[in-house]
Amino acid sequence: MMCDRAVLTVRLVRSFEHRNFKPLVFKDVNLDQTVDEFISFVKQDISVRAGLPPPFRKFDYDTLKIIHQAHGAKTNELVMSLEDDEKLILREGCRLRACGVANETELAFFKMTDYIKFKADPHSEW
């Protein structure tokens, strides 16, 4: 029987160029909820999470992408891989489990327009 609950790490990405991100751990996540439901949950959580700097709380995140899955190979990119978007970006309306999310998956949460801009010219400013 598959585990219905999982521990997920969500990396809040404010800037790809400056490698400005903050990882957060979410426990007891229902993998049968939709991507939209999880995005709403994360946005609500970060808006009130103690210890999270205001710039991270107020940023307009809109997209989730799988960075790493348990027991899988990690990317050499410091923020996240720029490859396999079709496979790794979570689709609206899809259930987390159906999108490939499992226990101990690490996800990036970012603004898609920033990602597209960075992907077209991937340089770092630090």
From Swiss-Prot:
**Coiled coil where?**
none
Cited InterPro entries: UPF0538 (IPR018794)
What the entry lists under PANTHER family is as follows:
UPF0538 FAMILY MEMBER (PTHR18444), UPF0538 PROTEIN C2ORF76 (PTHR18444:SF9)
Similarity-based family: Belongs to the UPF0538 family.
The name this protein carries in UniProt is: UPF0538 protein C2orf76 homolog
Organism, as annotated: Danio rerio (Zebrafish)
Phylogenetic lineage: Eukaryota, Metazoa, Chordata, Craniata, Vertebrata
